[in-house]
Amino acid sequence: MDILQIVILALIQGLTEFLPVSSSAHLILPSQLLGWSDQGLAFDVAVHAGTLIAVLVYYRGTLRTLLSGAFGRREAAHLSLDGGQGIDRSDADSQLHTATASKDVITARDAWREIMCLVVATIPVMLLGLLFATAIDTYFRGLNTIAYATLGFGLLLGVAYRFRGADGDEQPITRLDHALTIGLAQALALIPGTSRSGVTITAASFLGYNIATSARFSFLLSIPVISGALLLMLATQSDAMAGDAILEILAAMSIAGLSAYLTIAFFVGLVKRIGMMPFVVYRVLLAALLFAII
């Protein structure tokens, strides 16, 4: 791969991994319009590793709060919906009182509930991915499928936001039945063009959560999903990585990671200002472009 190809594809992966617009729908465009060949396993591993590092770094405070709340801490812990670093409960009793009175408080019980929700929501996509990965690669990788999924799930996102997600609940997702529903929806993202973040935000919105809560859960949910995808790629196709240039891999990882981090950082604030409908319109236009290419 030349440097231009690395930069463009890594940027596409990083920018679209956490936006509700389908990374696969965008990654197929260069190959169709510019005749680029498949980027190879090493590149896929690099960009996925970059996006995983991005979400881990951005939500490091939230993850630390969840884990400290779940293991051995009796007092309430502050959990910011936007991925902030939280408040050290040992600083002052007044801080604890203030945080406890806020809506962004998580107890040890709630920390365990949210961790369990993330686990439950991960199970469907892991199981179905292991069982049907080959079939999906064989029958659902075509441009037709990507175009229809981009359009259909984009319109569904618009319906969810219009009728449920704009003014929904802002509390963290701690109901296991809701987590399972979101997890089942996430499994649909195995179909290229669906958008993992898009379909999970859609499901959470239909369940009555607002965009900030839906996006936060979706982004946290990406951690086990991307980790699992990386492990699967390495376990089944590691021989394909032999001889790849380390500088190309590091460049792809860095570009994808930085662009993914910036996307996460700006997404919720952007949606609060412009809503989700611009993303819906964008998906419709993207689908139209894909249909025109077919």
Give each language-model segment a name:
Residues 1-294:
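Multi-pass membrane proteins that catalyze or facilitate reactions on polyprenyl-/lipid-phosphate substrates
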